[in-house]
């Protein structure tokens, strides 16, 4: 090959290589642009699709790194779409309850700006648990805290914080309410918020941060709801609401709500005579509630809710060791499953219980007459056998010498089962403690455990003499 042919050959090869490189660069550019726009396609859900995002939740997306010659392209995959909760897993087998959380709100109020509250409760979304309470529109170290023993004022609002975070000045006020319930359907929070005049109150239904529906008092006598979490199954949430006498016949309705809209209302049926302040839990495919009879019984009413046909059945907890306060002593108390026991029926306190096969787990004040102390235990055949009194696995949560208050249940879904947890309201101040002019609370929270556990007492712990007056 002569020199001219060599030059021509080398030139042709160089031109071919340059052309190939040119087309490769074009291909790389097209791939980069395509992946960039695909990323935005994936990250934009339909307008009617609610993503599983709360202000305190950080979505962590999996990142794929693709290398093309010298260029690095990052492709973010779409977050998994939120799904409605169905609560179809079995209930966890437990041996008792272990300490979970305590907010120490009253002790912290001695030296900080903490809200005055009452009627606390706990509820969880699929990722985190939150504590709620009805605030009094003031902090404790504030003259507006005087006379906050009154429970229905236009200044009361529903407060919401991550569990364990006391209600400080930065706390979110979810809605205006002197009675409330909250639950998460897997996609967003539903808040049921009652406020207004005693004889003409309004219940607002707030879903995903927006007011969706409302309903007016139907009996014109203090419309009220659970003061603990409602329950949602497959996108339908249910909440128990009562309007009418607190010491006589009242009108209880069970509301069914989808994304904040009331879709059905059922009237209480069955043998329960008086139902309010229910503590509800998912019992797939339905919902079960254990409530307060403020009229005839110190045994607690049960409300079973059918989420498919909206039917309601009610009766009473069978355990002869009854759960309300006031009550007779254990040797004299009774319950026969169907009717109120007509023992110390007037007044009462919010509480909870849940079935475990034929047995029942329950909590109650240690004192038979006042909201003092708190204990939990299991009653063998207490769910199915009238007047059962065989108690096992008793635990003291708050000793008899310290104050307690309302208590309620909430459920937490684990990998293989649904755990039951409870909170206890630790009331301080008026009426019992007249050294101060305010009434407020802290909380302590326990959850079911299949492990072992010790003993103790977890009272509020604030020295009333060190508190602001």
Label every PLM stretch briefly.
Residues 4-38:
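Single-pass membrane-anchoring alpha-helices
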Residues 165-167, 213-220, 264-267, 314-316, ...:
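A short beta-strand motif characteristic of beta-propeller blades
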Residues 192, 239, 420-428:
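Short, aromatic- and glycine-rich surface loops/edge beta-strands on solvent-exposed regions
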Residues 173-182, 222-230, 272-279, 347-351, ...:
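Repeated scaffold domains used in trafficking and secretory/extracellular systems
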Residues 289-291:
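Extracellular cysteine-rich, disulfide-stabilized repeat modules
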Residues 437-469:
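Blade-level signature of beta-propeller repeat domains, shared across WD40, Kelch, NHL, RCC1
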Residues 200-204, 249-253, 297-303, 372-378, ...:
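Structural motif
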Residues 61, 70, 86, 146, ...:
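N-linked glycosylation sites
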């Amino acid at each position: 090959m002569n020199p001219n042919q060599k030059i021509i050959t080398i030139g042709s090869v160089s031109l071919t290589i340059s052309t190939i490189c040119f087309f490769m660069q074009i291909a790389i550019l097209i791939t980069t642009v395509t992946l960039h726009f695909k990323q935005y396609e994936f990250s934009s859900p339909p307008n009617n699709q609610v993503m599983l995002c709360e202000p305190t939740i950080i979505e962590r997306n999996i990142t794929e790194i693709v290398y093309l010659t010298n260029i690095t392209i990052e492709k973010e995959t779409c977050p998994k779409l939120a799904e409605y909760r169905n609560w179809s897993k079995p209930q966890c087998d437990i041996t008792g309850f272990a300490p979970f959380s305590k907010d120490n709100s009253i002790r912290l109020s001695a030296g900080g700006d903490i809200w005055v509250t009452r009627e606390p409760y706990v509820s969880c979304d699929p990722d985190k648990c939150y504590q709620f309470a009805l605030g009094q529109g003031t902090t404790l170290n504030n003259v507006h805290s005087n006379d906050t023993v009154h429970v229905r004022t236009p200044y009361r609002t529903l407060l919401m914080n991550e569990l364990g975070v006391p209600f400080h000045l930065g706390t979110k006020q979810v809605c205006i309410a002197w009675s409330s319930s909250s639950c998460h359907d897997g996609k967003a929070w539903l808040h049921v918020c009652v406020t207004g005049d005693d004889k003409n109150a309004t219940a607002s239904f707030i879903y995903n941060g927006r007011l969706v529906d409302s309903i007016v008092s139907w009996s014109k006598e203090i419309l009220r709801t659970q003061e603990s979490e409602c329950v949602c199954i497959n996108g339908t949430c249910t909440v128990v609401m009562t309007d009418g006498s607190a010491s006589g016949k009242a009108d209880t309705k069970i509301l069914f709500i989808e994304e904040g809209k009331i879709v059905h209302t059922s009237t209480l049926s069955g043998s329960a005579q008086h139902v309010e302040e229910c503590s509800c839990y998912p019992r797939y495919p339905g919902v079960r509630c254990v409530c307060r009879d403020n009229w005839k019984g110190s045994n607690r009413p049960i409300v079973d809710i059918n989420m498919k046909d909206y039917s309601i059945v009610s009766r009473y907890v069978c355990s002869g060791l009854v759960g309300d306060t006031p009550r007779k002593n254990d040797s004299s108390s009774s319950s026969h499953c169907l009717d109120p026991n007509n023992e110390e029926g007037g007044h009462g306190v919010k509480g909870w219980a849940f079935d475990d096969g034929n047995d029942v787990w329950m909590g109650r004040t240690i004192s038979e007459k006042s909201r003092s102390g708190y204990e939990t235990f299991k009653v063998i055949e207490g769910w199915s056998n009238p007047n059962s009194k065989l108690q096992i696995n008793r635990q003291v949560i708050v000793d008899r010498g310290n104050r307690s208050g309302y208590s309620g249940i909430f459920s937490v879904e684990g990998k293989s089962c649904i755990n039951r947890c409870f909170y206890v309201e630790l009331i301080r101040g008026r009426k019992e403690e007249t050294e101060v002019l305010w009434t407020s609370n802290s909380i302590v929270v326990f959850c079911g455990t299949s492990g072992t556990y010790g003993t103790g007492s977890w009272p509020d712990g604030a020295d009333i003499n060190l508190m602001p007056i």
